Amino acid sequence: MTKVAREVVEKAGVNADKLLELLVKNASAELTTYYYYTILRANLIGLEGETLKEIAEIARIEDRNHFEALVPRIYELGGKLLDDMKKFYDISACPPAKLPENPSVQEILKVLVEAERCTVRGYTQICNMTAGKDHRTYDLALAILNKEIEHKSWFSEFLGEGSSGYFMRREELSQFVSKFLK
């Protein structure tokens, strides 16, 4: 599969090495975000924090699912994950979503929004690179992009940055990404 997948992608005009670099960096971002969202979620306390805890938990689990969905495509294209977790962390496409010094709900929301904005930019770049050329990677990146936009919107709305055009779906798996996890 690796040889054919890479050959098809390259014949379509996609730089497979650059694509793999982006996929691995975004996989790193998803896994590290999952880790940091665990810490952020644990610090969403009080009446206001408890209101957001479930939303942060859903975004956290979906980010882990995004990581799981990216891994097969990375290997299909002949890539691999780094075998050193520290190095894998260091190549993340996004800065760490660390708990702010002042862990108020507002400050945690700002961290969550910035983390989601970064992933939106990352998957937009992958979509732009693969649109009309690498249908499988494009489909995967677009599915994740749709979820990241939704996550960003959830958190942005709590900061009063946008209209409430999104709502949280109570599904076990993302309707966009679940087909890649079967």
Where are these regions (language model features)?
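Iron-associated oxidoreductase/ferritin-like identity signal
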Residues: 1-182
